[in-house]
Amino acid sequence: GGQNLIEDGVYNCLAGEPWEQGINGAIWALLSVDTKGYPIPEGAKYSREDLIQYILENQVKSGGWTLSGNIADADITGMAIQALAPYYTGDEAVKAAVDQGLTFLRNGISADGDLESGGDYNCESTAQAIVAFAAMGIDPSSVTSSGGRSLMDGLAKYYNTSTGGFLHKSTNRTSNALATGQAMYAIAAYRYYQQGLSLYDFRDTANTAQYVARADGAVYTAAAGADAALFVGEGA
């Protein structure tokens, strides 16, 4: 028994369309099939192109994405960029959409280096932006506010020294499980970026493959490995 999460959950989705719950579904479906480059057979109900197109069609005027309505949200924008990142150099429509999304995130960075969702600056929005920039081969520590505080500085704002966890909002007193989980994988994404790797690349060859970094339209390559360092040019 059991179900194949890639076949039954994505390209031959048994529970309606992959985006049944909204754009979140399409984003994570695309991330899932790309973790190991899973092939989608001819005749499948849904293709990679279907997932990409759904994400592109749901970008809002401000350049970001949202779970509902027409006001862009940093969390969903970050996730959408993460899903589209592998297609940036080969698809002009994807490139244009991602560039707009990155601009939206950059413009939303506060003086402290964090981002907000629903009017509240918080850990999770900041974490998703970090993962998005890392996925694009852009050093999150180089993405700064006008005052010079980086996204990594913004994330550190939510660290709870008394518990080792992360707060949802800086005014909270108790660490939050969701905030801590997202902060930890944002830190992992940053570490992978430093090694020339990608958070969502689960291929067996990921540690030895050549990594292509996409930074504001420029393409850089570096031998990826445990000790590899990746330096992205100016404009990243």
Residues covered by each model-derived region:
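An alpha-helical repeat/solenoid feature that recognizes helix-turn-helix modules
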Residues: 1-4, 15-48, 60-97, 111-144, ...
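Core helices of alpha-solenoid repeat scaffolds
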Residues: 6-7, 48-52, 98, 102, ...
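Flexible internal linker/loop segments at domain or repeat junctions
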Residues: 103-109, 113
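Extended hydrophobic/aromatic segments used for targeting, binding, or gating
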Residues: 145-159
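Terminal, non-catalytic domain-edge segments
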Residues: 154, 165-228
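Gram-positive cell-envelope targeting signals
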Residues: 232-236
